[in-house]
Amino acid sequence: MKRDSNRNLVRKRADDSDSDDYNTFAGLEKDSGPEEMSSLSFGAIRNAQKNLDKENEDDSDSDSDSGPEENSGGYERSSYKGNNKGKGNNKEDGGPKKRLKHAPSEASSKKRVSVIRPIPGLTMTKSGADSASRDSKLYRDIRFDATYGKANEDRVREDYAFLDEYRREEIAELQAKLKKTEESYIRSQIQTQIQSLQSKLKTLEKRDFRKKVLNEHRQQQREQAKDGKNPYYLKRSDQRKLVLTEQFKTMKKKDIDRAIERRRKKITGKEKKDMFSGRD
């Protein structure tokens, strides 16, 4: 106890000496000149400086506790951290209130608008959502959906047979336009369009001819079945031969020779390919 009392006494004397040095330094700073200031010891100057720094800190703490100051512009000045920390938490400070249940939804204006828009009547599938929707089709159209079965090609051909006449008219217009055009680039584009339309029209005509030949053969077999004879239904290879034979009957000799030569080259190329692949 005696030792603690001695320590407290020493601290009190040290504080008194510091305060005396500070008072002396402050009085000399106000009333004396530089000659009297130079007579002070370094210890007294240091202690006085510590007391001044402590007073400045106390003043700054009292200013911050008193509230935000108003600058010359008329708005409140506060720290950035304080504003962010209290944002949305203090309802008394005018922060954002809780959203109402039936309030309209808000969307960010920075979000990009999707290129793919919803189409009424079509269900949009999200890829990766489930195993059934993991395909390249984004929209499902019931007209071309495989789950509804295969399309009736014969019925489709009958319903849209009138388009052949439009294709022929378009080919005639493009051919007339080709005669008037002199630029090579535009001519090549027109020729490509003409070849595409002619190829499509030729494919449809071949399909119609094949269907006609096979229907006639089936009709003959039905009539023979009515007469008591056994019907004979052709295999696919026999169907191709029958269609090819009937096709040659309708062609000219020049076209037949050209078709035979083309077919001979095709078969020869296939045989050569099979021969070289067999060596490997």
UniProtKB/Swiss-Prot annotation:
GO aspect biological process, one term: maturation of SSU-rRNA from tricistronic rRNA transcript (SSU-rRNA, 5.8S rRNA, LSU-rRNA)
UniProt cross-references to InterPro entries, sorted A to Z: RRP36 (IPR009292)
Keyword Ribonucleoprotein tagged: yes
Record's subcellular location: Nucleus, Nucleolus
Coiled-coil zones: 165-208
Location of the region described as Disordered in the Swiss-Prot/TrEMBL record: 1-135, 214-238, 261-280
Biased composition (Acidic residues): 55-68
Keyword Aminoacyl-tRNA synthetase: no
Keywords: Coiled coil, Nucleus, Ribonucleoprotein, Ribosome biogenesis, rRNA processing
UniProt feature, compositional bias: Basic and acidic residues: 1-16, 268-280
A GO CC annotation given for this chain: 90S preribosome
Subunit organization: Associates with 90S and pre-40S pre-ribosomal particles.
Biological role: Component of the 90S pre-ribosome involved in the maturation of rRNAs. Required for early cleavages of the pre-RNAs in the 40S ribosomal subunit maturation pathway.
Similarity comment text for this entry: Belongs to the RRP36 family.
Protein name: rRNA biogenesis protein RRP36
